[in-house]
Amino acid sequence: RKVLLMTKMTTEEAFVKVLQMHGIEHAFGIIGSAFMPISDIFPDAGITFWDVAHETNGGLIADGYTRATGKMSMVVAQNGPGITGLVTPIKTAYWNHTPLLVVTPQAANKTMGQGGFQEVEQMNLFKDMVCYQEEVRDPTRVAEVLNRVISKAFRGSAPAQINIPRDMWTQVVDI
């Protein structure tokens, strides 16, 4: 019989462990309040975050970096209006068959659908531009969902989206 040992860590740590497992070392975009908790641990994890002047630039740079190096990168934007700036680069990456991790922070689960601060229907926005998309609904599944999204991007040779409500961060989970 196999015994599975669980380790407690924060959802941010679990997210970064999955990025490391897949060799993602570069992220591009703008980090807003909905993604802020994770940015502090990128440097120690060997992940370089390249802050850009506009989300569109981040998406285009991520696409170019991935195509030039053959290494998947990540693009992230602030929820709502910031996410809309990723439309052109993500569709471009889709047409270029670029495997790209698209991270879209979102309003909190409890306020979604109520017209909260900078709320946009982010899943609908990208549904025709990604090979796969999934939203995290349970903090204990952040690593599982992220792993699946990255794997689908590699297999589909196209961008894949993980939508993460802001209340998924700063949770302690068993991994």
Residue ranges and their predicted role:
Residues 6-175:
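N-terminal alpha/beta PP-like core and its mobile active-site loop of ThDP/TPP-dependent enzymes
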